[in-house]
Amino acid sequence: AMQPAEYVEFLVERIANVVAQAWAARKPASAGWGLGHAVLAINRRSVYADGTAQMYGPTDAANFRGFEGGEDHGVEVLCFWDADGKLIATSINVACPAQEVEGLWQIDADLWHPVREALRAKHGNDLVVLAWTGAAGDQSPHLMYNKRAEERMRELRKLTRLEELSRRIVAGWDEAHEGATQERHGDVEFKHTVETIDLPLRVVTDEEYANANAK
């Protein structure tokens, strides 16, 4: 099997070639952006009355008090049109990892595959759909709360879980696209900026250290 270092070399070469080809083939176009919403991920760390937290911890326990952090339901969208006004590409950013399907010996796009299929059915098979996973630390698409209600509604819609998640993304994309298409810009500045941000470290208490060593 290909090792990580080998795959990086394999991938970087191909990405570089695609970028060079795209740059050489660039043509006049316009861009627009918009914001929609979709409930996709939830914080996966349950918090209990004694102050402890557990990853994927049960939420039906009597001492369950909430989740360790919040979630971001924004669907940030970029759209690109050619000189004739045809939608040729879109990028979609959601704060949710593509990991609804796990533990299988296969490589797939998870929830993004049905998203691409749905958008291409509306806007043409040659539409490029670029998926971005935003800031999604401790976020998960796995159901943590209202499980029975969520599953009931999904079954009534006769959808798989992947189809349900993609349905929400596409609905959010439609909201964003409706706004983006009204403000198309042909003179957008193209630049690359990198910033290094210093974040404070979380200090482990003596009690937490002792508990961790005791396990």
Residues of each region from the PLM?
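Non-catalytic substrate/cofactor recognition surfaces at enzyme active-site rims
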Residues: 1-215
